[in-house]
Amino acid sequence: KFALSWMKDLINHAKKRGLYVQFSFEPRITSVEQTVATVHDILKTYPNIDALELITEETGGWGAGCTRAETEATLNNFFDKSVATDSAVNAPIKEKQSDLNALYMQIGIISKAIKQLNMDKTMHPEFKLGIYCSITPYTKGAYRLARLALPETKICLMSSHGSEGTAQALPSVVLTSQDRKMTEIYSWIEFDGLMYLYQNSISGNEKMMKWLSDSSDNTVSSILFNHWRSAENRTSARFATEATLDATVSAERFYRAYANRLSITDKKRFIEAMQLVNRADVFATTNLGNIGFCWMGAWGNGGSYTWMSKDNIDYARTIYLNAGNLLKDILKQTEKGTEANHYLSFICNRVLCSVLYLDAFREAVNIQGVIGKNQTAESQAKVKQICDKALLIFDQYMAKHAEMLEDRGCEGTLVSVWNSPIRGLKIYRAQFGGVPMDVPSSLDAVDAPPLPIVY
């Protein structure tokens, strides 16, 4: 009840200030009738929303398996023959694969539900169909399917993880000027799979805006930018704001203007540092999949410590460390008490936190060589030693992060890291090291390494 009341107040607050409010939910695989009933419940609860998006659940390769026959049967069941047999819709179908049948089925359910809802002319909000799919061949087919099934309905498209992936995927999915007019693009200011690392999404959003501005008709319905926090994202969010007003704004020009406003004198090294963070962001999104995922469920069985690549961790860590050292030198040149000093101090803090997070992960993945079905006393002791050291580094991460709590989002990050990756590592320590979950980080006080950046 509290959550519903809070959301109502938030929506009413936004409406009073003239904002357009769009609500989104995942019907998932249920009946058309149940989906329509859920829509009515949502509109009864939140009558002031302007639009309601019915979006597919995320498709990324981990879903249920399916056969060609099953997917073709789904197409024939939900869509007209001309749609079901469209070459672009059928292009990603294989004899055996994961996810695609579920994705197409959800589009079928949503499209039928929207058609039924649109028959009632008294319905107030605009209905939109959302697609969240990070497998580009699937995205192409799904987007084409949605456009053919609902040509007068806006499609909300989340085509990848991170802004760089979005910029790469969009040109092969959204093909025509009419497609652009009927598409709401989801991009990213911040990716939830890297929540515990400092991020910079500017290069990807720069490329996306260039793609839009270079097209013969640069009209697009709208662009939605995913993000969860404010303090960590002030620079990336500012770029997204300026780029949507002027798509010709380059990243370098933006950085120079940003540094000017803050009176940062060493603009060259500031730009270099921010580009390094951007590079680390792109690399981690691609090669350290969900290493900082803020969803607790990802860590329910322990998490990614058993398969994450140490080489990739080292590579990302080096980039962050180089960025941190540049920022540290710039910070020394700024006067204490100035906005530039506060801004750079915060970024230095979060870059250092990123290094510490990767240090903890780098230590924790050493369990890969000692875990197994038949743990010996020796291997259990080794697992415990590895986990204890990693947990102490996580303690360093939390302590450093807590030095600069700019807003509730910063506080929430601490709660999240404790309940997700730290808890996940304790699950492995209990499972393979025989240590109860409620035991502190270390009983033996293994020395944690010194902090890599001092400022």
Predicted feature residues:
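Substrate-binding cleft of carbohydrate-active enzyme catalytic domains
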Residues: 1-120
